[in-house]
Design a protein with these regions (language model features):
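Glycine-rich flexible loops
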Residues: 1-254
Length: 254
């Protein structure tokens, strides 16, 4: 059996410690929502500092096992810069490192393989602008064609070109991705996109859907609380989910 005990805690700044706890909470939230793929997929978070290091989950642990102290700090070549018993999944840092390095505001990057997200990613038409959730994402979703398992750094520039400045992406035949300046904001975007995919999967099973006019899409996106700083731009939602995690298991804070 693998030894899940962390290495002796490394000295980190109070700011990094806060970010580690928040990122570990996010992994537990994903586990609670069922947004897991065995030990695969990743949520990464840039660590403040000129080195531009970022935190990633240890490869081999389920999201429900991630804690603040066992998160691995790596550079953009995927090398651990602090001691860890666990390796890093090459497919994780290939996608995430490209986005962290290429988009200044991409402090957080999330990637999922949910059933609904992958189903829409496999659809020729992509995201249908026909429901309450997709209508809040007008002009915010990019598409990137499938090039195979993402272990080749050469895909990075093409991925960045596909994304441009859009905070969400559907990776064709693959899954969903979102990036943002914080965990709560990135989560809000990904949650909207995944929820839109869930509704699309259910509604299209019943026959043709009713598309929402573009002017209404624009209005919905402008009015969405998910992007409104007055309502936390996702912070209030993430705080509520963190409280749910706290009630169930505080071990993520270790």
């Amino acid at each position: 059996m693998s030894n899940l005990a962390p290495l002796p805690r490394q000295e980190v700044s109070s700011e990094e410690r806060t970010l580690r706890v928040q990122l570990a909470a996010c992994y537990r939230v994903f586990a609670m929502l069922g947004w897991t793929e065995l030990i695969y997929n990743h949520i990464t978070l840039r660590v403040p500092g000129p080195e531009r290091h970022f935190l990633i989950n240890p490869f081999g642990l389920h999201y429900s096992e991630v804690t603040a102290s066992n998160l691995v700090k790596i550079d953009h070549a995927g090398r651990a810069v602090t001691p860890s018993r666990w390796p890093v999944n090459p497919a994780g840092f290939t996608i995430h490192a490209a986005i962290h390095a290429g988009i200044e505001g991409a402090h957080c990057v999330m990637h999922t393989h949910t059933t609904a997200g992958m189903a829409v990613a496999c659809s020729r038409a992509g995201l249908s602008m026909s429901n309450f959730y997709s209508a809040q994402l007008h002009g915010k979703v990019a598409y990137h064609d499938f090039e195979g398992i993402t272990v080749h750094a050469g895909e990075g520039p093409r991925l960045l070109a596909s994304i441009g400045t859009k905070p969400a992406a559907i990776l064709r035949n693959h899954g969903l991705l979102a990036w943002g300046e914080s965990i709560p904001r990135t989560f809000a975007i990904l949650w909207l996109l995944n929820r839109a995919c869930e509704i699309q999967l259910a509604s299209t099973a019943m026959g043709p859907v009713l598309e929402i006019p573009e002017d209404i899409q624009k209005k919905c996106t402008a009015d969405s609380l998910q992007f409104d700083p007055r309502f936390g731009a996702g912070q209030d939602v993430f705080d509520a989910l963190t409280r749910m995690i706290d009630k169930a298991d505080l071990s993520y804070r270790d």
